[in-house]
């Protein structure tokens, strides 16, 4: 009996030892962070290391970025290869969405609800546009146009401009649900920027350049009447390269680079502030009754603006100001040595994020 029992015991011990080794080496899996609600598909990589850039400054990305945007408690950005990343503001962790990559990506625009992106890419040296849905990960090629933008009031609506060689160019409405175009207004012009700040209002202007005398036109879609906002003001010189930025509530900034002037208007087009400093509208963000702006501290008076700024030829020290829009008081909260800060976002009462075009980096700043 003992002669048969010993082999059986040996087999049992061998199986137990193998099971223990397998559990120690394989059975214990590393936990993978949960995906945020806007990423139902694709793979999520493990957290990447975040680089500390100073006591109050946190660099988010490791690779140069095309820019970023904020949605809920996440900061999303593309690197120069078209890979998509997101940073969790709650856990302070950075993740890569490995199921998404766009070749030849040169920029993007974000819808009001932050759920859709207009992707800007190049094909045979020609600018093209696609619509990317963050929830479904579906991509739709938009019809060939020269410029397209989201409306501020409906993420399924937008505005487009299309140049025509043998007839008048067209400004119209885009329906992003089926990628259809609806012509609304004919115009003899080319290379226009277009905006859709209100349901019955389209704004258009020449692409800003030092060599182009500027006008900013407000088109009432009900009456088809057009108003030139620039003609309502008297300037000591004709402004060129005028730039505009609309905020979610319909208010907007108007910048006159050739005159080094910056103005803030209400939704009703009433001039509220003529600031004592100059900066480019892309360097500002409005949050309730506060305006945050990164402003150059040294700007060559001979520089051709905004052309040299668009071309990345200007680097300068900057200050970030917090401006109270109720009384106009200005407070400096940060100063850089060399930077080109754009796309400020308010994270909390003492924290903002921004993108630096010089370093190609996204930063979190606590003040």
Kindly give the residue locations of the regions a language model identified.
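Short, solvent-exposed loop/turn segments at conserved positions within beta-propeller repeat blades
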Residues: 77-80, 122-127, 163-169, 207-214, ...
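Sequence/structural signature of beta-propeller modules
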Residues: 1-63, 71-73
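Beta-propeller domains
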Residues: 75-99
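Predominantly a core beta-strand signature of beta-propeller blades
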Residues: 54-57, 92-96, 136-139, 178-182, ...
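Short, conserved, GDST-rich strand-edge loop motifs in beta-rich repeat architectures
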Residues: 207, 294-315
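Residue-level marker for isolated small/hydroxyl-bearing positions within beta-strands
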Residues: 78, 87, 120, 160-163, ...
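Beta-propeller blade signature
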Residues: 131-135, 173-177, 217-222, 261-267, ...
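Conserved beta-propeller blade repeats
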Residues: 63-70, 101-118, 139, 143-159, ...
């Amino acid at each position: 009996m003992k002669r048969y029992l010993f082999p059986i015991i040996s087999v049992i011990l061998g199986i137990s030892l193998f099971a223990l080794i397998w559990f120690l080496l394989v059975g214990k899996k590393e936990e993978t962070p949960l995906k945020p609600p806007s990423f139902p598909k694709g793979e999520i990589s493990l957290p990447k290391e975040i680089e500390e850039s100073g006591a109050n400054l946190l660099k988010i990305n490791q690779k140069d970025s095309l820019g970023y945007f904020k949605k809920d408690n996440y900061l999303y950005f593309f690197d120069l290869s078209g890979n998509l990343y997101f940073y969790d503001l709650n856990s302070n962790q950075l993740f890569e969405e490995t199921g998404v990559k766009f070749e030849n990506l040169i920029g993007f625009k974000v819808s009001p609800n932050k759920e859709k992106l207009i992707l800007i890419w190049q094909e045979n040296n020609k600018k093209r546009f696609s619509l990317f849905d963050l929830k479904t990960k579906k991509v739709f090629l938009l019809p060939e146009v020269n410029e397209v933008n989201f409306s501020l009031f409906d993420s399924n609506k937008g505005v487009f401009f299309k140049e025509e060689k043998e007839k008048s160019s067209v400004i119209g409405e885009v329906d992003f649900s089926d990628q259809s175009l609806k012509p609304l207004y004919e115009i003899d012009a080319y290379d226009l920027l277009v905006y859709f700040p209100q349901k019955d209002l389209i704004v258009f202007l020449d692409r800003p350049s030092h060599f182009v005398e500027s006008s900013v036109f407000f088109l009432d879609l009900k009456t088809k009447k057009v108003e030139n906002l620039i003609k309502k003001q008297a300037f000591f010189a004709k402004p060129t390269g005028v730039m505009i930025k609309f905020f979610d509530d319909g208010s907007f900034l108007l910048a006159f680079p050739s005159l080094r002037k910056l103005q803030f208007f209400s939704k009703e087009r009433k001039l509220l502030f003529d600031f004592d400093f100059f900066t480019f509208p892309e360097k500002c963000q409005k949050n309730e009754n506060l305006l945050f702006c990164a402003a150059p501290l040294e700007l060559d008076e001979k520089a051709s603006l905004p052309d040299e700024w668009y071309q990345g030829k200007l680097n300068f020290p900057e200050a970030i100001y917090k401006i109270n829009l109720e009384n106009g008081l200005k407070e400096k909260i940060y100063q850089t040595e060399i930077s080109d800060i754009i796309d400020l976002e308010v994270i909390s009462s003492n924290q903002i994020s921004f993108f630096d075009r010089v370093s190609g980096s996204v930063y979190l700043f606590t003040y």
